[in-house]
Amino acid sequence: MLVYLAEYLTRFYTGFNVFSYVTFRAILGLLTALIFSLWWGPKLIERLQLLQIGQVVRNDGPESHFSKRGTPTMGGLLILAAIFISVLLWGDLGSRYVWVMLFVLGSFGLIGFIDDYRKVVRKDTKGLIARWKYILQSLAALLIAFFLYATAANPGETQLVVPFFKDVMPQLGGVFIVLAYFTIVGSSNAVNLTDGLDGLAIMPTVMVAAAFALIAYLSGHVQFANYLHIPHLPGSGELVIVCTAIVGAGLGFLWFNTYPAQVFMGDVGSLSLGAALGAIAVLVRQEILLVIMGGVFVMETVSVILQVGSYKLRGQRIFRMAPIHHHYELKGWPEPRVIVRFWIISIFLVLLGLATLKLR
């Protein structure tokens, strides 16, 4: 929004031309989202407490989690508000990348909100029925996938980038829609499964978003893209604004979500942030890289799949409890130890993912 105002004011003072630089707006976007989260966080927590919107804790979970019962949830509303305000202020509203991301965040945030509302306000422990949640996620993801495929302006927007291989970038054709669908829905649910400990999901989300900010910037410059053998995607630099807004909002939320948490993000936060990471990966053509950098999310998801599959096929569980972070809790690891070690793994995987841009 302010890009247009700055463009007009440049006629009178050339210093306003600085707003045309993505890097400058990205920094302002990060700071805006961060300050907004820190400023409004206490007010939201107080409001959630007054409304008695507290976390529902499963009775078969670790005993240490019983103390979390009643902790304010749906804090993802704070994250989404910070991201929306930041992106609307500093993003180029003429960019299709910006509107796609706002739709992703809004639609999946709405699905998560309905789920949270049924759990904590309606006191329905099951929340939104899994079948309906998946149907709504699928509708949103397919709408996005079809739109991106139909509006692709150059071949690079529908290629598949394969890490470690310099010139392996096959055209996907209609398979693009299938890959985009599974990436967005899968990432949304993976982050949702990871959000089980204080700060466990938000920090890896921030790390992956920061890495994608760099990748989006490189993809938007033809020289960097050609040098790194990644698709050149004109205009993808606007995704940097979205990514840094996620980083700022995430760090601001972590201030209140760190152990012991004052607020949880709820499904309204985890489903929308996960979908956002998936959508960004699709937009910059780095779906496989998301699997590497978001390895913590993948690990959590795979642990649930293995646990359920093993129990149904053999009648035995592989882990003491799934997702896998609960397994380590039941082994006696203190919650902060589990969280920090998963963060360390996430840092390693994000750096490994970035290294693949050059290791080809």
Curated annotation (Swiss-Prot):
Superkingdom classification of source: Bacteria
Keyword line: Cell cycle, Cell division, Cell inner membrane, Cell membrane, Cell shape, Cell wall biogenesis/degradation, Magnesium, Membrane, Metal-binding, Peptidoglycan synthesis, Transferase, Transmembrane, Transmembrane helix
Location of the protein in the cell: Cell inner membrane
Reaction it catalyzes: UDP-N-acetyl-alpha-D-muramoyl-L-alanyl-gamma-D-glutamyl-meso-2,6-diaminopimeloyl-D-alanyl-D-alanine + di-trans,octa-cis-undecaprenyl phosphate = di-trans,octa-cis-undecaprenyl diphospho-N-acetyl-alpha-D-muramoyl-L-alanyl-D-glutamyl-meso-2,6-diaminopimeloyl-D-alanyl-D-alanine + UMP
Enzyme class, first EC level, given as a word: transferase
Keyword check for Protease: no
Family according to the record: Belongs to the glycosyltransferase 4 family. MraY subfamily.
Function: Catalyzes the initial step of the lipid cycle reactions in the biosynthesis of the cell wall peptidoglycan: transfers peptidoglycan precursor phospho-MurNAc-pentapeptide from UDP-MurNAc-pentapeptide onto the lipid carrier undecaprenyl phosphate, yielding undecaprenyl-pyrophosphoryl-MurNAc-pentapeptide, known as lipid I.
Protein name (Swiss-Prot/TrEMBL): Phospho-N-acetylmuramoyl-pentapeptide-transferase
Provenance organism: Shewanella sp. (strain W3-18-1)
Lineage: Bacteria, Pseudomonadati, Pseudomonadota, Gammaproteobacteria, Alteromonadales
